[in-house]
Each structure stands twice: as structure tokens, then as C-alpha cells.
Amino acid sequence: MRFRERPNSPAPVQTHGNNTVELIWTIVPSVFLFIVLVGTIYTMFGLTNFTSANSRPLQIRVVGHQWWWEFDYLNEHIVTADELVIPVGTRIEAQLLSQNVIHSFWVPELFGKTDVVPGHDNMSIFQADNVGTYRGQCTEFCGLQHAHMNFNVIVKSQDDYNTWLSAQEQSASSTPTDPTALAGQKLFLGSSGCQGCHGIVGVNLKDDQHLNSGADASVLVGPNLTHFGSRREIAGAVLQWDPATCVVVTGSNGQPSIQDPEACGLYQWLKDPQAVKPGNDMVIRSLSDTEIAQLIAYLESLK
């Protein structure tokens, strides 16, 4: 009531616009946005245009599984799991595929995330300029163990990478010399059922049967284990794999066993994979401690 209009009240000053102010608040933000646009375009092109020490890009097929990563080196004909080894200063062209649900491929210190979609090939292009180990992970919720779908990018000097590559291109020994490892190989190929999901080139796979993906996706269900002994993390980079903590000893009964089972991540995985990573595809085989020790001795020999 107090501020109601009264008869003969004076009219307030009327403002009908200020061309100068309107031009300023239009031009200044436009210039700012243009600067941001130019910087964004420059950065986007810079992300995929590298000055590489190696003129030939390294082409790798990256396959997202539940819940681990497969890395297939297309020109080198080798495959690894959970560890992507690359040379420093080389353009990497990663072809991204999924065998099940949507994943997302991301290494925060090297590149932004890119979705990995079933039935749709995607691409991530990057380059690592410093030697070191970089942690990667899935950033798209993909099921129960999404948080445990990790991997490492291991960047080596060109010479170290060439040495690693030469070793990876070799098939596994068909007959281990160590008797415990030999017993583990027989177990792998026999009653344990391991070979039903895993393959080892030179043992139960030919050189052209190493893929989990592509034209013959039925060859393997689990990770390729040809050079398992050279890796340092397993089960989607959830467990450490260190031979020093998985020492195989012979007991008074003449049977092998693991010296310290609690410290051995691979022992825990083989004993009860569902306790380590519930919902994963690896079934419990009810292996005895002796059988686990034999399998560990064999897997360790696969360097």
C-alpha cells in the first residue's frame, strides 16, 4: 500500500538503451569466445599431429573385456593383456573395440578418454614423450568390477622396446625343463581346464591363433598367456605378480608348494578368483596347493 501509485506521481527516468554499452557487451565476449575457439582448434589438431622419432606409427588393437584389456600389436603379431608396452616418441594408433558392453579407454597422463563401443570401431591416437609407467583405467561403468578394470602403459626407450618385442615374438617353449613347471604345463593342458579359455602360442595355439578378437573371436576367452611371466600385474591390474613373492618350495613330502601363499597374488587368483574379483569369467577349479604351485612354476617360466 505504501508504494502504490498516487495521483500526480512523477514518472521515473526512462532508459531506452545505450548503444555504446550494448556494443561493448556484445563485442568483448565475442572476441573472447573467438580466442577460445582458435586455441581449442589448435590444441585438437596438436593432439593428433606429433613429431615422432619413429616415422612409422604403431598400430594396436585394444579390446575391452569384462574386466580386463587386451592389446593386439597388429603388425608385430603379438598380444598382451593389461600391460601396453610402447616405444617413447612414437605415434600410437589404437583401434578400440569391445566384446561386450561400453567401456572407455583413458590414461590421464597421456590422453583423454575415448569410448569403446560394441559393434563400432573407435580410434585413440597418442604419443608418450617420456619413459615411464602410466596408469590407465576404464571410465565408463561396465558392470560389477568396473572399478577394477585397470591397465598400465609402459613406455620404453626404442632399444629396450626392440628387446622386449623380440622376446614377445617368440613362441613359448613346448617342453619346460623344470619338472615342477612341466607338471604345471600338463595340468594346464589337462584336468585344470585352463586351456579351455587361455592360449599359449607354441603350446596349444598356432602363431596365427593368438587373438581374442577380430575374425576368429572364439579362439580365446581369457587373456593370452604366451609371455605371462614377463608381466607384473594380473586380473585387470588388480593383483601384483612378482615371482619373488611366489617362491615354489619342495616340502618334506616331496610335493611343491608356495612358500608364502598370502603374499602371492597369483596364488590367491588361482585359489579363488571370485573372492578376488567377484563376477569375473574365471571359474573356481578347486585346485590343491600342489597343483597351484605347479601352475605358478609353469606360468613363471613363460617369459
Stretches found by the model and what they are:
Residues 1-193, 199-220, 233-272, 276-278, ...:
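Non-transmembrane, membrane-proximal soluble domains of secreted or membrane proteins
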